[in-house]
Design a protein with these regions (language model features):
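Extended, compositionally biased non-globular segments
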Residues: 173-243
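TerminUS-proximal long segments
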Residues: 233-272
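Long, hydrophobic, well-ordered secondary-structure blocks that form the structural core
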Residues: 67-116
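Single conserved hydrophobic/aromatic residue that forms the stacking wall/gate
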Residues: 2-13
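Aromatic/basic-lined ligand-recognition segments
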Residues: 101-204
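Long, hydrophobic/aromatic-enriched structural stretches that serve as scaffold segments
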Residues: 23-82
Length: 272
């Protein structure tokens, strides 16, 4: 069924090559249920919640995750429809989020998102793709997702200068504050865990204005899940005298699941 799904989505892509892509993630529980190859990817586990002094990175169930991207919404719709048709009799949808690009790549809270992403192809491959450390799964990736709901009323009540202290960057031109002026509990101070530990973020804003449910769908890819876990622990538990990431006072994580992303060749091998 994986092979049929891949071929079907490939046909959609060929008809409408609108920067379309789809990434399939498989969770630890699904890996065991589907009796996929052993040993498992080295860091594929069930994500355990991280309970901080005030906020919690929750753990929620999920077997498969499909990350669909396309310039044209109609292409994304066709791809989602193909997935649904292929899996309707064996799976149910637990969550479906429709993201969108907000201005010049900003989050819905108005700040540029993904500034710390590795920029060169070599760096993105190094930090985002599994290498020789796990030869059986070389070329795959760890995908971690969280759905954050923002308290936009509280956020918009802050003056821009205070919002900038929460993020640790300027809002208009995306310039990082100096170490002297950046608060220790700012998002950029806590979520950035060093040049040797990076992930590939592909976050998207989502939501509906009418009911004021607006948020960020956090998606990251990494060659090691331990890097993601370190970042999350910093954010929710605190580090270096800061008790937690202050952005969490305005953003609540309502989901949290870890997946492994196999290559297309791996999927073919899984199907036999």
């Amino acid at each position: 069924r994986y092979c049929l799904l891949s071929r079907g989505l490939g046909d959609v892509y060929k008809r409408q090559p609108e920067n379309a892509s789809i990434v399939l993630g498989i969770s630890h529980s699904a890996w065991l249920t589907l009796d996929l190859p052993k040993p498992l990817p080295q860091e594929l586990v069930e994500f355990e919640e991280i309970r901080g002094p005030k906020h919690t990175a929750v753990s929620t169930p999920g077997d498969l995750h499909f990350h669909i991207r396309a310039t044209q919404p109609s292409v994304a719709y066709d791809m989602a429809s193909a997935i649904t048709a292929a899996l309707r009799d064996i799976a149910e949808v637990l969550d479906e989020v429709h993201g969108f690009r907000y201005w010049d790549g900003r989050s819905i809270i108005g700040f540029v998102d993904g500034t710390e992403n590795p920029q060169t192809p070599a760096a993105r491959e190094y930090f985002g793709i599994i290498g020789d450390s796990d030869p059986m799964y070389r070329g795959g990736s760890y995908q971690f997702v969280q759905k954050y709901i923002h308290d936009m009323t509280a956020w918009n009540a802050l003056p821009v200068s205070e919002q900038e202290k929460v993020i640790g960057r300027s809002k208009h031109d995306d310039i990082e504050m100096s170490e002297d002026e950046k608060p220790a509990n700012s998002h950029s101070a806590i979520a950035n865990i060093g040049d040797d530990f990076k992930v590939i973020r592909d976050n998207m804003p989502f939501g509906t204005v009418g009911n004021n449910e607006l948020g960020t769908y956090f998606i990251c890819y990494a060659s090691t899940f331990s890097t993601v876990q370190k970042m999350l622990k910093n954010m929710f538990l605190g580090v270096d005298g800061a008790n937690y990431d202050r952005l969490l006072d305005f953003s609540t994580a309502v989901t949290g699941t870890l997946f492994f992303v196999p290559t297309v060749d791996m999927l073919g091998d899984f199907a036999g």
